[in-house]
């Protein structure tokens, strides 16, 4: 599932994103954030973090640097 989500995002980056002007208000971009989140936290939590990030990417949010949160270590 993780691989599928990452492949979908990479497809977006390669085929759809070049057709639109750059509008992401964040660094890293929302699609790169999604890949990093899914690699770090897995498909479910990483996917959820990606959805939350995309919902924040609008003209009324200032944007800025928003890295993927680190995975919490289990004790």
UniProtKB/Swiss-Prot annotation:
It holds the Pfam family YidD. Keywords: Cell membrane, Membrane. It comes from the Bacteria. It is a peripheral membrane protein. It is found in: Cell membrane. GO terms for cellular component: plasma membrane. SMART domains: Haemolytic (SM01234). Could be involved in insertion of integral membrane proteins into the membrane. NCBIfam families: membrane protein insertion efficiency factor YidD (TIGR00278). Belongs to the UPF0161 family. This is Putative membrane protein insertion efficiency factor. The lineage of its organism: Bacteria, Bacillati, Bacillota, Bacilli, Bacillales. The gene is ytjA.
């Amino acid at each position: 599932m993780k691989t599928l989500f990452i492949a979908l995002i990479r497809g977006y980056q390669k085929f759809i994103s070049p057709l639109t002007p750059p509008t992401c208000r964040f660094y890293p971009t929302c699609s790169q954030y999604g890949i990093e989140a899914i690699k770090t936290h897995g498909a479910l939590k990483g996917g959820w973090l990606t959805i939350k990030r995309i919902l924040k990417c609008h003209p009324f949010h200032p944007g800025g640097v928003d890295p993927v949160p680190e995975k919490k270590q289990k004790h």
